[in-house]
Amino acid sequence: CKGFDAEVAKNNHRIIKLAQEKFVAVRQVEMKGVDLSQFQFDYDLNWAAMFLNADGTVYARYGTQSAQGADAYNSIESLEKTMRRVLALHNDYPANKTALAGKIGKPKPYKTALQMPGMKHRTKLAGGTARNNCVHCHNIHDAEHEQQRAAGRQNHDALWRYPLPDNLGLRIDPGDGRSVSAVQAGFAAAEAGLQTGDVLTHADGQSLTSIADLQWVLHNLPNTSANVTLKATRGDRSIEKKLAMNAGWKKTDISWRGSLWSIKPVLATWCAPMKENRVKSLRLAKGVKPLEVRWINTDRPEGRNAKRAGLRKGDIIIGMEDKPLRMTSQHFNMHVKLNYKVGDKLPLTLLRNGKRIRFDWPLTDRD
């Protein structure tokens, strides 16, 4: 992501020239004073852009991320195409206002991050911005989690934010942002008749300039049985397909999301992957991915409780729920948060000084 950011901000002359000549570019590096009703996007992204008219109309969003990595869906080529599509929308404005109306979200009950009821450390954050005192983008989702928890409304459906086109069975060319590069059999897109080579232009009436624009439409649909109407060009003709998604269609791999760490239960430890030579020396079954406890955060009650129960720095997790551990550190964290509640115990198998130990990790958040 740093490489992509540098390419956009400094190195790519086409992007710089286009931005300077046709846009008023503003670079925002934190969320402290941002109008959260106006600027609604996936706050877990490492890099995001929004394109607006001076009257607040949203033309487009750009920036997509997944467990595949920060740049799997982004490219200079598709960013430039999005920018040129935005210029076309701007030239047609306000005649095309209807196709843009849904691009701005419903007003929030608060204006900025520091007004969010769930935002922690608000007094400290209200001070001057510094490296250790800024509101990160993912902190917005963190605060949303806290609000939902306080209101007793926390549920998994709220976690499936900004679903990828892949959830419809569509793979979009990252070099274009709208062109379908693959259609997966058995998914809604294939059932509706979309084909490789189709170029998406609208979703539920909204103009599309990027993958992120499609994600915005999908984000605002429920995780129950739902429909979305996609318009596309196929060769020299326009087509329209209605996709029908089954309940649970938004569920996806959220292990990469920074805001995942704020969801309870919190482990308050660093369980890190081990180097291959060390893994081999343990002589574990094929496919086991051990995690080493490198750090226990005793500044938090969750960490103190784990340590009191017997967890030690240097312990190696080799099993969970009486099965060999076969997941990454991120997926281990995700599994716990999606399958356990505060007050539960997480059954693990540890290696300590060469001996296997059963350890029931207390997932408590109070001393």
Describe each model-derived feature in a short phrase:
Residues 80-125, 147:
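Post-cleavage N-terminal segment of exported redox proteins
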Residues 41-50, 315:
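Structural micro-motif
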Residues 161-202, 206-209, 267-319, 323-326:
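PDZ/PDZ-like domain segments forming the peptide/carboxylate-binding groove
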Residues 1-18, 146, 151:
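Typically the conserved alpha-helix immediately C-terminal to a functionally engaged Cys/Sec
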Residues 46-63:
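A short, hydrophobic beta-strand/beta-hairpin element that forms part of a small beta-sheet core
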Residues 15-34:
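Thiol-based oxidoreductase modules, predominantly thioredoxin-like and allied folds used
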Residues 1-4, 130-141:
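The canonical Cys-X-X-Cys-His
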Residues 201, 216-256, 309-312, 318, ...:
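PDZ-domain C-terminal substructure recognizer with occasional recognition of PDZ-binding tails
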